[in-house]
């Protein structure tokens, strides 16, 4: 680097014209000198500075990265397909859900089946000798009127109750079967 001296000259704030009516007070001319180190540049263009990497990469990796970054999108897609075939992997194997699962956890834990919490009570069949008792049971279990309860047990199978708990479904099934109807829980 070359070392040079820079000079700054301080002047008075008064106008320097000779036509001024006021007598100008002469200010002493002061000069400050201080050294400045300037870089020796061969040309005035900005130089390319590489960003500092968190990890030093080997030259081979840098060259490979430069070549990959110069690929077109079509060439990059072909490269991905080639590497998937060569390495025997798929894009699905890199899904975030696969990362969350611990290796070997699936083999240790048995498959968990979700227990059903809502059930439907279906009246499958009502014999003719049990119609009146079934209508009474339907009216007792619901707030249906006589006509609506009668229409419910005609044209079977029909859903009697939907989305009820297991206990409520079993209780309704028990009462309807005591009345003589054939009932199933779905």
Curated annotation (Swiss-Prot):
Residue numbers spanned by region Disordered: 1-24
InterPro entries, per database record: Ribosomal_bL12, Ribosomal_bL12_C, Ribosomal_bL12_C/ClpS-like, Ribosomal_bL12_oligo, Ribosomal_bL12_oligo_N_sf
GO cellular component, one term: ribosome
GO molecular function: mRNA binding; structural constituent of ribosome
Ranges of Low complexity composition bias in the record: 12-24
Annotated protein name in UniProt: Large ribosomal subunit protein bL12c
Residue interval of the organelle targeting sequence: 1-53
UniProt xrefs under HAMAP family: Ribosomal_bL12
Family stated for the protein in its record: Belongs to the bacterial ribosomal protein bL12 family.
Protein location: Plastid, Chloroplast
Assigned keywords, A-Z: Chloroplast, Plastid, Ribonucleoprotein, Ribosomal protein, Transit peptide
Feature: compositional bias, Polar residues: 1-11
Pfam families: Ribosomal_L12, Ribosomal_L12_N
Major localization class: plastid
Tree of life domain: Eukaryota
GO biological process: translation
């Amino acid at each position: 680097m070359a070392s040079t001296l820079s000079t700054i000259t301080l002047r008075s704030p008064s106008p320097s014209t000779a036509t001024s009516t006021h007598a100008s007070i002469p200010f002493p001319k002061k000069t400050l000198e201080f050294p400045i180190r300037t870089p020796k540049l061969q040309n005035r263009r900005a130089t390319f500075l590489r960003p500092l990497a968190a990890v030093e990469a080997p030259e081979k990796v840098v060259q490979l990265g430069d070549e990959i970054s110069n690929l077109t999108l079509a060439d990059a897609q072909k490269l991905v397909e080639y590497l998937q075939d060569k390495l025997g992997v798929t894009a699905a194997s890199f899904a975030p859900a696969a990362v969350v699962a611990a290796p070997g956890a699936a083999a240790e834990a048995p498959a968990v089946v979700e227990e059903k919490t809502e059930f439907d009570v279906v009246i499958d069949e009502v014999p003719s000798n049990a119609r009146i008792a079934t209508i009474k049971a339907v009216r007792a279990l619901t707030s249906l009127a006589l006509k609506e309860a009668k229409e419910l047990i005609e044209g079977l199978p029909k859903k009697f109750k939907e989305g009820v708990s297991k206990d409520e479904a079993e209780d309704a099934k028990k009462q309807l079967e005591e009345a003589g109807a054939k009932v199933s829980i779905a």
